[in-house]
């Protein structure tokens, strides 16, 4: 019997890293550089699990064509896959706030997942330092996760920190305080990525797995890969 409190990622290694899958009732932050598979990850979790998906697309990164490709490659009904996703496209930080607030009334028992991709795009584009606004939006998402019993994935961008010489997540402390589970994606080589578990409610931090990006979406990397 499937554990309905966990959503599979479709990647055995990622599911094991996360203690069985993406948990309902909490916020999972996924961050990393461009083209490391963050959006594909969020889409795949929505595709492979029962329930509708509220997908807040702030960057125009959600691709119906890509979702259709993933569904078709897995022999899933493409039309049903597309119908599962309810897309919102806020054009600035204020619209993002309004959309997230509306989700409190929109998300019901038919939904299993909420995605904000990416959570910090407008914040970054507007050169904002309003950490309080992001914190308020995260509080709403926390409420939705708990009260509506859905999983919430917030995709985050990175910036180069000249002091430490490493890439860090935007609004690191604000998101770090509100997100219980944190995954970092990194590029290894063409098509192959690494997922690092930076924090988890009960899993040891620092664990990592390899995965690859294919027509199906994200897949486990086998030894011969």
UniProtKB/Swiss-Prot annotation:
Q: Ribosomal protein: present as a keyword of the record? A: no
Write out the residues that bind ATP: 32-39
The molecular function GO annotations come to: ATP binding; ATP hydrolysis activity; ATP-dependent DNA damage sensor activity; damaged DNA binding
Keywords associated with the record: ATP-binding, DNA damage, DNA recombination, DNA-binding, Nucleotide-binding
The keyword Zinc-finger appears for this protein = no
InterPro entries, per database record: AAA+_ATPase (IPR003593), DNA_recomb/repair_Rad51_C (IPR013632), DNA_repair_and_recomb_RadB (IPR011939), P-loop_NTPase (IPR027417), RecA_ATP-bd (IPR020588)
What are the recorded Gene Ontology BP terms?
DNA recombination; DNA repair
Q: Which Pfam families match?
A: Rad51
Give the protein's biological function. Involved in DNA repair and in homologous recombination. May regulate the cleavage reactions of the branch-structured DNA. Has a very weak ATPase activity that is not stimulated by DNA. Binds DNA but does not promote DNA strands exchange.
Give the UniProt family note: Belongs to the eukaryotic RecA-like protein family. RadB subfamily.
Name of the molecule in the record: DNA repair and recombination protein RadB
**Species of origin:** Pyrococcus furiosus (strain ATCC 43587 / DSM 3638 / JCM 8422 / Vc1)
């Amino acid at each position: 019997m499937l554990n309905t409190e966990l959503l599979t990622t479709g990647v055995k290694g990622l599911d094991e890293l996360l203690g069985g899958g993406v948990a309902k009732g909490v916020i999972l932050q996924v961050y990393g550089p461009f083209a490391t598979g963050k959006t594909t990850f969020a889409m795949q979790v929505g595709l492979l699990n029962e329930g509708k998906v509220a997908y807040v697309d702030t960057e125009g990164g959600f691709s119906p064509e890509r979702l259709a490709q993933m569904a078709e490659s897995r022999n899933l009904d493409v039309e049903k896959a597309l119908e599962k996703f309810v897309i919102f496209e806020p054009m600035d930080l204020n619209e993002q706030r309004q959309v997230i607030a509306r989700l409190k009334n929109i998300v019901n028992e038919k939904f299993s997942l909420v995605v904000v991709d990416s959570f910090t795009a407008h914040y970054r584009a507007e050169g904002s330092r309003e950490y309080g606004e992001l914190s308020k939006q995260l509080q709403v998402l926390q409420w939705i996760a708990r009260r509506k019993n859905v999983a919430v994935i917030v995709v985050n961008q990175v910036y180069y920190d000249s002091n430490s010489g490493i890439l860090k997540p935007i609004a690191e402390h604000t998101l770090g305080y509100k997100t219980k589970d944190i995954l970092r994606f990194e590029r290894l080589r063409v098509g192959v990525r690494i997922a690092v578990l930076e924090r988890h409610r009960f899993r040891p931090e620092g664990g990592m797995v390899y995965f690859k990006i294919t027509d199906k979406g994200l897949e486990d990397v086998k030894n011969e890969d």
